[in-house]
């Protein structure tokens, strides 16, 4: 077969009515005693291969007929157009070579429980639905980077191991670090992005983030990917404007590049895109509580707005909303205190509808040296561990703001999924560390 070009399912248009070789895996097979239809997976795409006894002969046809799911093969034949095919083409087989057998593949076409599928995640990735989800994830990742690069943001690779607490000390993964005491898996790259704005003005990072939250909800992972951005000379209002434009732009681009995959997922993106045609309402935390009380919720100032209450608010406003100016005691030390109400901070969470919940958290940062020391002391955090961070407030400090968005919740929203565990290749949850 070496004299015939070996092609990918991504390059089929160039080889219509030509002899080609396609290498891949048997995704499925069906047919009769005269012909078999193989779904051949290559490059994450499925190509239909037609195997006819009249062309192949009895012996080869019987080999084809008894192929098992996930057997790897090299198939030669003529590529023809077929508008009924998901990729628009079909391969008429004239030769086949088995590369690797597949015995007793555990994920058969029948229904399986989610616990079993998660335990077989290394194999479950091959299913049509999971193929589509991970392509959407890839498209989102591309759209995120494109958005920031087109607006002159610089990518900063922030450390995974850190000696500083970025969010809550109660959600840290800790490990001994030689003779230097404890190191922590990063909860955020934000503190390091703040250092970088003094060199580059507009920066972002995109990578894994770790939270040791003892939560088993459908919205939580202990390891997830977060994109974070930080901008010098930007206030709270600037930050909200950037976040809204970012979310609308990357969702639209991701959807446009994922239409076939969303079709596989039976996700109609029309309602999602409709949300993006309106401005996102901005309401104060205090106003949110007033609305919830009118709906019969027993909630007092200082209480958390849980996921159920978040969804009540998105339903009230008919789409995504920003909730801003949360109680100071409930938020991180680096958030700037609201000068109009010192009990609150200049922050906001973007809440997505459809059961998704918070997808962005952002704030204006405290730029004053004395104020941030007071906040560290309020949080009972060791000031000496933040010497380098405090230096940023001593040498040319400026107003600045930023935000972080969790990729998996965004993917769940775009794909219409009920759980974030399917939105990352190998999910890490409180009860799951394998495979």
Swiss-Prot record:
A GO biological process held by the record: asparaginyl-tRNA aminoacylation
Major subcellular site: cytoplasm
Xref: Pfam families: tRNA-synt_2 (PF00152), tRNA_anti-codon (PF01336)
Catalytic reactions of this protein: tRNA(Asn) + L-asparagine + ATP = L-asparaginyl-tRNA(Asn) + AMP + diphosphate + H(+)
Alphabetic keyword roster: Aminoacyl-tRNA synthetase, ATP-binding, Cytoplasm, Ligase, Nucleotide-binding, Protein biosynthesis
GO terms for MF: asparagine-tRNA ligase activity; ATP binding; nucleic acid binding
PROSITE patterns: AA_TRNA_LIGASE_II (PS50862)
Any one GO cellular component localisation term in the record: cytoplasm
InterPro entries recorded: Aa-tRNA-synt_II, aa-tRNA-synth_II, aa-tRNA-synth_II/BPL/LPL, Asn-tRNA-ligase, Asp/Asn-tRNA-synth_IIb, NA-bd_OB-fold, NA-bd_OB_tRNA
EC number: 6.1.1.22
Record carries keyword RNA-binding: no
Subcellular localization, as worded in the UniProt entry: Cytoplasm
SUPFAM superfamilies tied to this protein: Class II aaRS and biotin synthetases (SSF55681), Nucleic acid-binding proteins (SSF50249)
UniProt enzyme class: ligase
Transmembrane domains' residue ranges: none
HAMAP family listed in its UniProt record: Asn_tRNA_synth
Quaternary structure and partners: Homodimer.
Family in the record: Belongs to the class-II aminoacyl-tRNA synthetase family.
Protein name as it appears in the record: Asparagine--tRNA ligase
Organism: Leptospira borgpetersenii serovar Hardjo-bovis (strain JB197)
């Amino acid at each position: 077969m070496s004299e015939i070009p070996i092609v990918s399912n991504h390059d089929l248009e160039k080889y219509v009515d030509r002899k080609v070789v396609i290498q891949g895996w048997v995704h499925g097979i069906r047919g009769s005693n005269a012909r078999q239809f193989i779904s051949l997976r290559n490059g994450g795409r499925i190509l239909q291969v037609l195997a006819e006894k009249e062309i192949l002969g009895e012996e080869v046809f019987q080999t084809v007929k008894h192929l098992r799911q996930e057997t790897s093969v090299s198939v030669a034949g003529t590529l023809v157009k077929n508008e009924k095919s998901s990729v628009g083409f079909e391969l008429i087989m004239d030769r086949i070579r088995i590369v690797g057998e597949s015995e007793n593949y555990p994920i058969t076409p029948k229904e399986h429980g989610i616990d079993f599928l998660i335990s077989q995640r290394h194999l479950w990735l091959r299913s049509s639905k999971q193929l589509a989800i991970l392509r959407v994830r890839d498209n989102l990742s591309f759209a995120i980077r494109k958005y920031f690069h087109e607006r002159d943001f610089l990518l900063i690779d922030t450390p995974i191991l850190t000696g500083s607490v970025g969010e809550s000390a109660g959600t840290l993964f800790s490990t001994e670090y030689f003779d230097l005491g404890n190191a922590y898996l990063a909860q955020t790259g934000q503190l390091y992005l703040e250092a970088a704005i003094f060199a580059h003005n507009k920066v972002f990072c995109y990578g894994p983030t770790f939270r040791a939250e003892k939560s088993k909800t459908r919205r939580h992972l202990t390891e997830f990917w977060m994109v974070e951005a930080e901008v010098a000379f930007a206030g709270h209002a600037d930050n909200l404007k950037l976040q809204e434009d970012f979310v609308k732009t990357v969702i639209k681009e991701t959807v446009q590049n994922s239409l076939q995959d969303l079709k596989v997922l039976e996700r109609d993106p029309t309602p999602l895109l409709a949300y993006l045609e309106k401005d996102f309402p901005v309401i104060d935390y205090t106003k949110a509580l007033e609305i919830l009380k009118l709906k019969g919720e027993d909630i007092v100032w200082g209480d958390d707005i849980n996921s159920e209450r978040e969804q009540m608010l998105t339903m009230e406003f008919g789409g995504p909303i920003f909730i801003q100016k949360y109680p100071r005691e409930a938020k991180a030390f680096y958030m700037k205190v609201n000068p109009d109400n010192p009990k609150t901070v200049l922050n906001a969470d973007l809440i997505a509808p459809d059961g998704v919940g918070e997808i962005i958290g952002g704030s204006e940062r405290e730029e004053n040296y004395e104020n941030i020391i007071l906040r560290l002391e309020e949080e009972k955090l060791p000031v000496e561990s933040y010497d380098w961070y405090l230096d940023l407030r001593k040498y040319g400090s400026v107003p600045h703001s930023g935000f972080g968005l969790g990729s998996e919740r965004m993917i769940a929203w775009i794909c219409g999924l009920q759980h974030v565990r399917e939105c990352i290749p190998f999910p890490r949850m409180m009860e799951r560390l394998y495979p």
